[in-house]
Amino acid sequence: VIVIDHHIAGPELPKAHSVVNPNRLDEDGAYGYLCATSVVFVVIAGMLRTLRQRGYFSTTSPAPDLLSQLDLVALATVCDVVPLVGLNRAFVRQGLKVMAQRQHHGLVKLADIAGVNEAPNVYALGFLLGPRINAAGRLGASGLGVKLLAAEDPDTAAGLALQLDDMNTERRRIEES
């Protein structure tokens, strides 16, 4: 078991093969500003580097394109409201470029419903897309956001994006009452 976290850790760590957390008491805190998704991204990047060095990948079995996932890292970074410094700033800047390529069906359909018609920016992530994804969790259906982000076809993504948009409308109605 590998535990990955970003919250400030106490003196006792979970029983696991490894606990990766830049906010452990025995860490220097240089990356304590990262959100959990960014920590996961860095861990996976390190794993891929090690696998490359050991010759695991080849022309017939290439390494996954981790950079194509930076749009998801950017979304998580902005929505977790962590400081936009250091790696966070780099992840968001590059992630917005990836998002502008409109590769992830779920983000494309959600952006379309949310009216993000131009190149995405931090405002779109934090105030238009993020709240729609988070609304499902607030209404007891947190898995819906994950399904959207993992959707592999546009039709499924469109239906999920519509559901999330409806849930966000319901969430706002509840919060206003």
Range-by-range predicted roles:
Residues V1:
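Phosphate/diphosphate-binding loops
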Residues I4-K15:
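Short, glycine/polar-rich helix-capping loops at beta-to-alpha or helix-loop-helix junctions
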